[in-house]
Protein backbone atom coordinates (compact mmCIF):
# COMPACT_ATOMS: atom_id res chain seq x y z
CA UNK A 1 0.00 0.00 0.00
CA UNK A 2 1.14 3.53 -0.76
CA UNK A 3 0.76 5.12 2.66
CA UNK A 4 2.33 8.56 2.65
CA UNK A 5 1.71 11.90 4.32
CA UNK A 6 1.88 14.70 1.76
CA UNK A 7 2.10 18.30 2.92
CA UNK A 8 -0.14 20.72 1.07
CA UNK A 9 2.32 23.38 0.06
CA UNK A 10 0.46 26.49 -1.00
CA UNK A 11 1.68 30.06 -1.22
CA UNK A 12 -0.86 31.36 1.28
CA UNK A 13 0.79 34.76 1.38
CA UNK A 14 0.26 35.18 -2.35
CA UNK A 15 -3.42 34.48 -1.75
CA UNK A 16 -3.60 37.11 0.98
CA UNK A 17 -3.79 34.52 3.76
CA UNK A 18 -1.67 34.57 6.91
CA UNK A 19 -1.50 30.85 7.59
CA UNK A 20 -0.91 29.78 11.18
CA UNK A 21 -0.18 26.46 12.80
CA UNK A 22 0.35 23.05 11.27
CA UNK A 23 0.31 22.54 7.52
CA UNK A 24 -2.64 20.81 5.91
CA UNK A 25 -1.84 17.27 4.81
CA UNK A 26 -3.08 14.43 2.65
CA UNK A 27 -2.57 10.90 3.97
CA UNK A 28 -2.78 8.33 1.18
CA UNK A 29 -4.24 4.84 1.37
CA UNK A 30 -3.53 3.50 -2.12
CA UNK A 31 -3.66 -0.22 -2.87
CA UNK A 32 -0.54 -1.83 -4.26
CA UNK A 33 -0.27 -2.28 -8.03
CA UNK A 34 1.44 -5.13 -9.88
CA UNK A 35 1.83 -3.87 -13.46
CA UNK A 36 3.93 -6.86 -14.59
CA UNK A 37 1.00 -9.25 -14.42
CA UNK A 38 -2.08 -7.23 -13.57
CA UNK A 39 -3.99 -4.70 -15.65
CA UNK A 40 -4.72 -1.35 -13.97
CA UNK A 41 -7.94 -1.31 -11.98
CA UNK A 42 -8.43 2.47 -12.24
CA UNK A 43 -10.15 2.45 -8.88
CA UNK A 44 -12.39 5.28 -7.73
CA UNK A 45 -10.85 7.56 -5.13
CA UNK A 46 -12.48 8.99 -2.02
CA UNK A 47 -10.97 12.09 -0.40
CA UNK A 48 -12.12 12.08 3.22
CA UNK A 49 -12.54 15.25 5.31
CA UNK A 50 -12.90 14.43 9.03
CA UNK A 51 -15.13 16.53 11.23
CA UNK A 52 -14.29 18.38 14.42
CA UNK A 53 -15.97 21.78 14.26
CA UNK A 54 -12.97 23.32 12.47
CA UNK A 55 -11.15 23.00 15.80
CA UNK A 56 -9.71 19.48 15.49
CA UNK A 57 -9.83 16.43 13.22
CA UNK A 58 -11.93 13.57 14.56
CA UNK A 59 -9.79 10.39 14.50
CA UNK A 60 -12.84 8.16 14.00
CA UNK A 61 -13.68 9.97 10.77
CA UNK A 62 -10.24 9.66 9.19
CA UNK A 63 -8.19 6.48 8.99
CA UNK A 64 -11.04 4.20 10.03
CA UNK A 65 -13.12 5.44 7.10
CA UNK A 66 -10.17 5.15 4.71
CA UNK A 67 -9.56 1.52 5.68
CA UNK A 68 -13.23 0.72 5.14
CA UNK A 69 -13.10 2.35 1.72
CA UNK A 70 -10.09 0.19 0.83
CA UNK A 71 -12.08 -2.88 1.79
CA UNK A 72 -14.87 -1.74 -0.53
CA UNK A 73 -12.53 -1.39 -3.51
CA UNK A 74 -11.77 2.32 -3.37
CA UNK A 75 -8.48 4.09 -2.91
CA UNK A 76 -8.58 6.81 -0.28
CA UNK A 77 -6.97 10.00 0.97
CA UNK A 78 -7.59 11.62 4.34
CA UNK A 79 -7.44 15.39 4.00
CA UNK A 80 -6.48 17.09 7.24
CA UNK A 81 -7.34 20.64 6.29
CA UNK A 82 -6.27 23.75 8.19
CA UNK A 83 -8.00 24.42 11.49
CA UNK A 84 -8.72 27.55 13.49
CA UNK A 85 -7.44 30.24 13.61
CA UNK A 86 -7.14 29.74 9.84
CA UNK A 87 -10.33 30.99 8.24
CA UNK A 88 -12.37 30.48 5.07
CA UNK A 89 -11.48 30.12 2.20
CA UNK A 90 -8.25 28.43 3.34
CA UNK A 91 -9.91 25.00 3.69
CA UNK A 92 -11.70 25.39 0.35
CA UNK A 93 -8.37 25.97 -1.38
CA UNK A 94 -6.87 22.90 0.27
CA UNK A 95 -9.75 20.68 -0.81
CA UNK A 96 -9.42 21.96 -4.38
CA UNK A 97 -5.67 21.33 -4.24
CA UNK A 98 -6.27 17.75 -3.08
CA UNK A 99 -8.68 16.98 -5.94
CA UNK A 100 -6.30 18.41 -8.54
CA UNK A 101 -3.28 16.65 -7.00
CA UNK A 102 -5.06 13.31 -7.06
CA UNK A 103 -6.00 13.68 -10.71
CA UNK A 104 -2.44 14.61 -11.60
CA UNK A 105 -1.29 11.37 -9.95
CA UNK A 106 -4.10 9.20 -11.32
CA UNK A 107 -1.86 6.91 -13.35
CA UNK A 108 0.72 6.52 -10.58
CA UNK A 109 -1.98 5.70 -8.04
CA UNK A 110 -4.13 3.57 -10.36
CA UNK A 111 -7.21 5.74 -9.93
CA UNK A 112 -9.88 6.81 -12.37
CA UNK A 113 -9.61 10.61 -12.71
CA UNK A 114 -13.30 10.73 -13.56
CA UNK A 115 -14.29 9.03 -10.32
CA UNK A 116 -12.83 11.28 -7.63
CA UNK A 117 -15.31 11.68 -4.79
CA UNK A 118 -15.06 14.03 -1.83
CA UNK A 119 -16.46 12.83 1.49
CA UNK A 120 -16.93 14.68 4.73
CA UNK A 121 -18.43 14.35 8.17
CA UNK A 122 -19.86 17.18 10.28
CA UNK A 123 -17.57 20.20 9.70
CA UNK A 124 -15.64 18.07 7.22
CA UNK A 125 -18.93 17.76 5.36
CA UNK A 126 -18.94 21.54 5.14
CA UNK A 127 -15.46 21.46 3.59
CA UNK A 128 -16.57 18.82 1.08
CA UNK A 129 -19.84 20.52 0.20
CA UNK A 130 -18.11 23.89 -0.07
CA UNK A 131 -15.97 22.51 -2.87
CA UNK A 132 -18.95 20.78 -4.43
CA UNK A 133 -20.96 23.99 -4.58
CA UNK A 134 -18.17 26.51 -5.22
CA UNK A 135 -15.75 24.72 -7.57
CA UNK A 136 -16.53 27.13 -10.42
CA UNK A 137 -17.61 30.13 -8.37
CA UNK A 138 -15.84 33.40 -7.61
CA UNK A 139 -14.17 32.06 -4.47
CA UNK A 140 -12.05 29.65 -6.52
CA UNK A 141 -11.64 31.24 -9.96
CA UNK A 142 -8.39 33.06 -9.25
CA UNK A 143 -7.05 30.15 -7.21
CA UNK A 144 -7.54 27.56 -9.94
CA UNK A 145 -6.21 29.83 -12.67
CA UNK A 146 -3.36 31.70 -10.97
CA UNK A 147 -2.21 29.26 -8.26
CA UNK A 148 -2.94 25.81 -9.68
CA UNK A 149 -2.80 26.81 -13.34
CA UNK A 150 -5.80 24.65 -14.27
CA UNK A 151 -9.36 25.01 -15.47
CA UNK A 152 -12.13 24.89 -12.84
CA UNK A 153 -13.18 21.40 -13.97
CA UNK A 154 -9.86 20.06 -12.63
CA UNK A 155 -11.05 20.63 -9.05
CA UNK A 156 -14.67 19.56 -9.50
CA UNK A 157 -15.57 16.48 -7.43
CA UNK A 158 -17.36 13.74 -9.36
CA UNK A 159 -19.59 13.18 -6.37
CA UNK A 160 -20.04 14.01 -2.69
CA UNK A 161 -20.51 11.67 0.26
CA UNK A 162 -21.78 13.70 3.21
CA UNK A 163 -22.37 12.36 6.70
CA UNK A 164 -24.30 14.62 9.10
CA UNK A 165 -22.75 17.65 7.35
CA UNK A 166 -22.66 21.20 8.64
CA UNK A 167 -24.48 23.11 5.89
CA UNK A 168 -26.55 26.06 7.00
CA UNK A 169 -25.53 29.18 8.90
CA UNK A 170 -29.17 30.03 9.55
CA UNK A 171 -31.67 28.87 12.15
CA UNK A 172 -30.31 25.30 12.34
CA UNK A 173 -26.61 26.17 12.29
CA UNK A 174 -23.90 24.34 14.17
CA UNK A 175 -22.79 27.73 15.40
CA UNK A 176 -19.43 26.66 16.80
CA UNK A 177 -18.20 25.51 13.39
CA UNK A 178 -18.93 28.88 11.82
CA UNK A 179 -17.40 30.79 14.71
CA UNK A 180 -14.18 28.85 14.17
CA UNK A 181 -14.31 29.14 10.38
CA UNK A 182 -14.98 32.87 9.98
CA UNK A 183 -14.44 34.33 13.43
CA UNK A 184 -12.78 37.57 12.32
CA UNK A 185 -15.11 38.08 9.33
CA UNK A 186 -18.34 36.64 10.70
CA UNK A 187 -20.80 39.30 9.55
CA UNK A 188 -19.10 39.62 6.17
CA UNK A 189 -19.01 35.92 5.27
CA UNK A 190 -21.76 34.19 7.23
CA UNK A 191 -24.25 34.17 4.34
CA UNK A 192 -21.63 33.05 1.80
CA UNK A 193 -20.82 29.88 3.73
CA UNK A 194 -24.45 28.79 4.10
CA UNK A 195 -24.24 26.11 1.46
CA UNK A 196 -27.92 25.46 0.80
CA UNK A 197 -27.80 28.87 -0.89
CA UNK A 198 -24.78 27.97 -3.04
CA UNK A 199 -26.25 25.01 -4.91
CA UNK A 200 -26.38 25.37 -8.71
CA UNK A 201 -27.00 23.12 -11.68
CA UNK A 202 -23.23 22.48 -11.67
CA UNK A 203 -23.17 21.02 -8.16
CA UNK A 204 -22.20 17.32 -8.36
CA UNK A 205 -24.52 14.60 -7.15
CA UNK A 206 -24.44 13.69 -3.48
CA UNK A 207 -25.24 10.87 -1.09
CA UNK A 208 -26.28 12.52 2.17
CA UNK A 209 -27.07 10.79 5.45
CA UNK A 210 -28.01 12.03 8.89
CA UNK A 211 -29.99 10.96 11.95
CA UNK A 212 -32.97 12.84 13.33
CA UNK A 213 -31.62 12.43 16.87
CA UNK A 214 -28.30 14.15 16.14
CA UNK A 215 -27.73 16.41 19.13
CA UNK A 216 -24.83 18.31 17.58
CA UNK A 217 -25.61 19.06 13.93
CA UNK A 218 -29.39 19.35 13.42
CA UNK A 219 -30.79 17.05 10.73
CA UNK A 220 -32.27 20.11 9.01
CA UNK A 221 -28.76 20.78 7.66
CA UNK A 222 -28.98 17.74 5.41
CA UNK A 223 -32.63 18.36 4.61
CA UNK A 224 -31.92 21.91 3.45
CA UNK A 225 -29.11 20.76 1.18
CA UNK A 226 -31.16 17.90 -0.25
CA UNK A 227 -34.07 20.24 -0.89
CA UNK A 228 -31.82 22.73 -2.68
CA UNK A 229 -30.29 20.00 -4.83
CA UNK A 230 -33.71 18.65 -5.77
CA UNK A 231 -34.84 21.95 -7.30
What annotation goes with each model-predicted range?
Residues 1-42, 89, 171-175, 200:
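N-terminal cap/lid segment of alpha/beta-hydrolase-fold proteins
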Residues 32, 146-150, 183-204:
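Active-site nucleophile elbow and catalytic-triad environment of alpha/beta-hydrolase enzymes
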Residues 40, 58-77:
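Short amphipathic alpha-helix adjacent to the substrate-entry channel of hydrolases
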Residues 42-51:
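Short beta-strand element of the alpha/beta-hydrolase
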Residues 57-59, 64, 79-113:
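Catalytic nucleophile-loop/oxyanion-hole region of alpha/beta-hydrolase
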Residues 100-177, 190-191:
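Primarily recognizes the serine-hydrolase "nucleophile elbow" in alpha/beta-hydrolase
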Residues 202, 207-210, 214:
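Short beta-strand/loop motif that positions the catalytic acidic residue
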Residues 215-224:
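Conserved alpha/beta-hydrolase "acid-adjacent" motif
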Amino acid sequence: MIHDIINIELDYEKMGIEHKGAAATMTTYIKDMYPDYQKPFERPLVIICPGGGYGHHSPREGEAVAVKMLDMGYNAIVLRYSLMPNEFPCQLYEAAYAINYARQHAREWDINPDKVIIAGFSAGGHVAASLGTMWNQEELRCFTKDILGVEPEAVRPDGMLLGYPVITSGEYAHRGSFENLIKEHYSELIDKVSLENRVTADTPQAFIWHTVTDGSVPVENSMLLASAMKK
